[in-house]
């Protein structure tokens, strides 16, 4: 087991009707920046619930956070936050809005008004604004982790940032907010969460039975309840998927294990270049990447196939192959693409993806740092075959 330190201070308030808890989570009189995206929270009633719960607070608002939040938009939000002298940022939305809020919390207090390079180097202000959130789309686990994935249009980059101080102080998770989501959003969320688990689980075998066992439970939960969520969007399915997606990336299953994240880095590049939904880039890349790395990952792939999918094969190579095939089939069942041809007329250029990774300094990927740009090309070419 790799040495680790684990701390997750985010207060989770889970269940239907819990948006009303904002009235005691944020003290009366607090100046709040309400941050959200394209306005769906106004159509589904969440916005009005938030306003009712914060009746005694002083609100400033910033709308228009993109699905892949833009650094340039966050800079504008920072000006609003400074002018309103807010004491907390409240993100209401999915992972993109929450990512933006966590990044924004440091931008507001940074002396450098263009802090991208500082933050990319891990240099954050000592004092930042607190962040709270109301989750409306489960997928990323952003509501209780320290990571923000931000795109800079000027730099033509999409990269992750990590700042423990920006981890939300609280997260309200009301599964009822998912009732208005369409099947594409729901399918994306399930596959994103599934991939988060896989990238922490299918790596180097270690003495981590607790982490592996919990990862397998989460994967089986998403396999069982993800399709049910698409079929009837029931209260039970919403609850189970929302909680599993949170547990997939709150730090717990990643303790003491080597982590991969190569699928995510390649996926970020594809999204930055072509605007394809984040989860759909993961479903395009992961099956091919697992086949490419099947020999190195064979022990864990075979365990995965047997413990998660119930594969009976006793030969590890055969079990691993079946596990990858079943994963690809699951992505299709959730309505996501698994081949570049599935996103036509977009044509994904391996050269362009590699160029993005090189600009981002992501030239050695995977848990062994053994995936080079040349291998990224092979993975993308294999995906198209």
Give the ranges of each region predicted by the language model.
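ATP/NTP phosphate-donor binding region
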Residues: 1-88, 341
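A glycine/threonine-rich phosphate-anchoring loop and its flanking beta-alpha core
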Residues: 10, 20, 110-207, 213, ...
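Short Gly/Thr/Asp-enriched flexible loops that form oxyanion-binding sites at enzyme active sites
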Residues: 77-78, 97-111, 144-145
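Glycine/serine-rich anion-binding loops at beta->alpha junctions
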Residues: 86-102, 136-142, 273
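Short alpha-helical scaffolding segments that buttress acidic/His motifs in well-ordered protein cores
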Residues: 194-198, 238-249, 286, 327, ...
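Active-site segments that bind and position negatively charged phosphate/pyrophosphate groups
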Residues: 200-326
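C-terminal charged capping/lid subdomain of soluble metabolic enzymes
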Residues: 301, 308-385
